[in-house]
Amino acid sequence: MAAVVAVCGGLGRKKLTHLVTAAVSLTHPGTHTVLWRRGCSQQVSSNEDLPISMENPYKEPLKKCILCGKHVDYKNVQLLSQFVSPFTGCIYGRHITGLCGKKQKEITKAIKRAQIMGFMPVTYKDPAYLKDPKVCNIRYRE
């Protein structure tokens, strides 16, 4: 450093600062020098201030069909009965079961086949009882 000052003694302070900054940058590539006092310098790595890539923590995981990759058989009554309402005998829709379209069709066909073959009961109820029963009979004043 003393040699640089002796050689560049005729230069002004501003030019000397730029010369020292360039010399430090050449010796340590990938860093830049911040000069904030007369002879006091600090080297800062350029990678410290860059944003870090990470997954979105608020993103919901993708819902996957639980039967994809599984074989659906009309004789498997225990599996098929999970997709039929015990009160009405109606087959639950995709929005309730969470199945993909292909597996929902397979389940529907398997349930119909099992009902025709006699493996599963066919439940028909009076339309008056198709709605869910009310838990509390609360009468409001009119």
From Swiss-Prot:
It is found in: Mitochondrion. GO terms for biological process: mitochondrial translation; translation. GO terms for cellular component: mitochondrial inner membrane; mitochondrial small ribosomal subunit; mitochondrion. GO terms for molecular function: small ribosomal subunit rRNA binding; structural constituent of ribosome. SUPFAM superfamilies: Ribosomal protein S18. Gene3D superfamilies: Ribosomal protein S18. Coiled coil: none annotated. It comes from the Eukaryota. Keywords: Mitochondrion, Ribonucleoprotein, Ribosomal protein, Transit peptide. Component of the mitochondrial small ribosomal subunit (mt-SSU). Mature mammalian 55S mitochondrial ribosomes consist of a small (28S) and a large (39S) subunit. The 28S small subunit contains a 12S ribosomal RNA (12S mt-rRNA) and 30 different proteins. The 39S large subunit contains a 16S rRNA (16S mt-rRNA), a copy of mitochondrial valine transfer RNA (mt-tRNA(Val)), which plays an integral structural role, and 52 different proteins. bS18m has a zinc binding site. Belongs to the bacterial ribosomal protein bS18 family. There are 3 mitochondrial isoforms of bS18 in mammalia, localizing to 3 distinct sites in the mitoribosome. bS18m (bs18c, this protein) binds to the same site as bacterial bS18, mS40 (bS18b) binds to a novel location of the 28S small subunit, and mL66 (bS18a) binds to the 39S large subunit. This is Small ribosomal subunit protein bS18m. The lineage of its organism: Eukaryota, Metazoa, Chordata, Craniata, Vertebrata. The gene is MRPS18C.
